Amino acid sequence: MKHTFSTALLVLLAAGMLRPAEASADDLSVTFREITGDVTATADGSLDLFGLVLSRAAPANPSGVAPGSGFFQVGSEMPVASSLYFTSVDGNGSGPLSFGTAETITNATSGTGDVFGITTMPTSFGIYVPLGYASGTSITSESLYAGKSFADLGITPGSYSWALGRNTVTLDVVSVPEPTAASCVLFIATVACGRRRRRRWAI
């Protein structure tokens, strides 16, 4: 019986129907959007803290961004206590050292949700998470930079990615075009056409 079970297991592995357990990994996505004269930042996902080193002191920072220094934090505009983890110096962290030019922090005008941020160190990367964060817990937050543009904040549009321990953190910097006059006219015409159709069906 044992021999039969082992043979069946090998067949499933060879067919790709059964795979050995792999180390867990988590992903978190951050998006900066420029739209209608403001910049918004959102963070969503979860993290696996395995292999990351907890710092003894985690400063309470408000949400902000300094792209030239490779720093951003999403969440409340007020200083919030957080836990700061570092990638170790043995190579379990990689990614861009900057995503723009401004090295001075610009704080968000408002924000809400869980703390999440990345800071670039000489030999490692730092990760800000909610105080007492447990691996796999959902992180959701947003911040607003009212009246700001990517140019004001020194952010370069594009897509950036960090490999931090078992985690992949992506940062997308995208501009959302404002609606043109032509698109507004088309929208109004579509709504008007729909109303006429409903009237015909009503008759």
Regions found by a protein language model. Give the residues of each.
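Bacterial N-terminal signal peptides that target proteins for export
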Residues: 1-9, 180, 197-198
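Sec-dependent N-terminal signal peptides
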Residues: 7-13, 185-189
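C-terminal segment of classical bacterial N-terminal signal peptides
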Residues: 15-22, 195-196
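Mature extracellular "passenger" or substrate-interacting domains of secreted, surface-exposed proteins
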Residues: 24-175
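A short, hydrophobic C-terminal helix/tail in secreted or cell-surface proteins
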Residues: 177-195
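C-terminal membrane-anchoring or membrane-association module
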Residues: 193-203
